Structures are given as structure tokens and as C-alpha cells.
Amino acid sequence: METTLNHLREGQSARIKTLRMQGAMRRRLLDFGLIEGTRVRCLGSGPAGDPVLYCVRGTVLALRRQDSRCIAVETEP
């Protein structure tokens, strides 16, 4: 099912479909390995719910919810 990265629950995995953003932030996320087909797993969030931690290619990334709303993913069963 297609959704956005911010909708993943802790422990849930998905594959990147597309980045719906432009400019420096898009480039930075691509450099971190957030490209189409890459598996990402939600590890949880900070005490206030933001940022959210994700595991991408063995690296832990902290993304703000507003940024993760711009990343389309396909959830895995």
C-alpha cells in the first residue's frame, strides 16, 4: 500500500517510491541513500514525537515529520 514515510509505525518497514521535494533537502536525502526501491524501517521517535528515527541501508537517520511527509513509500507486509 502506498503512503508517506511519516505514517510508518515503530518497527514497520517500507520501500522508497519517490521524494516529493526539490532543492538541497532532496539532494541531501538522495546522498543518504533514500532512492527508489531502498528499504527503510521506522525505529521510533523522540520524546516529543519529533524527529523520527529510521534505519536506511544500515544507517540511522533522524528526520523531521514535515520532511518525512514528502517521501512516498510502499509498505511491506
Can you describe what each PLM-predicted range is?
Residues 2, 25-28:
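Short alpha-helix capping/helix-loop boundary micro-motifs
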Residues 3, 45-77:
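C-terminal structural segments of small proteins and small subunits
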Residues 12-25, 69:
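Short, structured beta-strand/loop micro-motifs enriched in basic residues and often containing a Trp
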Residues 15, 31-32, 44:
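Charged, well-structured alpha/beta interaction segments
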